[in-house]
């Protein structure tokens, strides 16, 4: 566990491709999708919260503090990241924040360790995950000192692109290996976008999780 690193799970999306609603509450292997994400991320951080809008009571079973966006207009993942940075700065003793999408049940159990190792010795830098040469901007380690710059970027510049904000600052990409799964391999950042993805995740679950 990295006690000086807080974590936030991003679950504020509208899930249009899944017919609306909270896809993180869909059942996977007998428990909510969110439960798998929490089980993998919680042991890696000192404090963990959930970024989601609407009635927080629907996430009560997760045991997490639920943080609504601090900017209006459903501004996407960057709004959740900003909310997480501001929460961590005022409610924890942590120095940085790791973010993860709430629809990725197989996220790396060494996500924080690898991102933190890459960022070590580079004060103020963002460490962002990648796999198979593809960047995953919502899986990143963010210095809390970037929160004012992010609020300006999101609110004053009205720019919602996560990668665009990352590229404006010093950053390092961290390549994560594929996971072994039933004789094959799967991207650890595999996410649930449509019903077929959920069916695939069900088949993969037993071969990936210990």
Predicted regions and their residues:
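Regulatory input/activation interfaces that engage signals or partners
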Residues: 192
């Amino acid at each position: 566990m990295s006690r000086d690193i807080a974590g936030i799970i991003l679950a504020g999306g509208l899930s249009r491709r899944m017919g609306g609603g909270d896809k993180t509450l869909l059942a996977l292997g007998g428990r909510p999708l969110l439960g798998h994400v929490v089980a993998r991320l919680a042991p890696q951080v000192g404090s963990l919260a959930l970024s989601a809008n609407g009635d927080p009571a629907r996430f009560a079973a997760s045991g997490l503090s639920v943080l609504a966006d601090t900017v209006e207009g459903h501004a996407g993942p960057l709004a959740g990241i900003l909310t997480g940075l501001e929460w961590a700065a005022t409610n924890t003793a942590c120095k940085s924040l790791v973010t993860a999408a709430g629809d990725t049940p197989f996220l790396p159990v060494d996500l924080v360790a690898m991102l933190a190792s890459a960022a070590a010795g580079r004060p103020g830098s963002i460490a962002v995950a990648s796999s198979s040469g593809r960047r995953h901007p919502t899986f990143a380690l963010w210095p809390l000192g970037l929160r004012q710059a992010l609020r300006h970027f999101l609110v004053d510049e009205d720019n919602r692109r996560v990668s665009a904000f990352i590229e404006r600052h010093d950053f390092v990409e961290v390549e994560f290996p594929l996971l072994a799964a039933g004789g094959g391999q799967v991207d650890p950042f595999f996410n649930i976008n449509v019903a077929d993805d959920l069916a695939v995740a069900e088949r993969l679950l037993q071969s990936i999780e210990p």
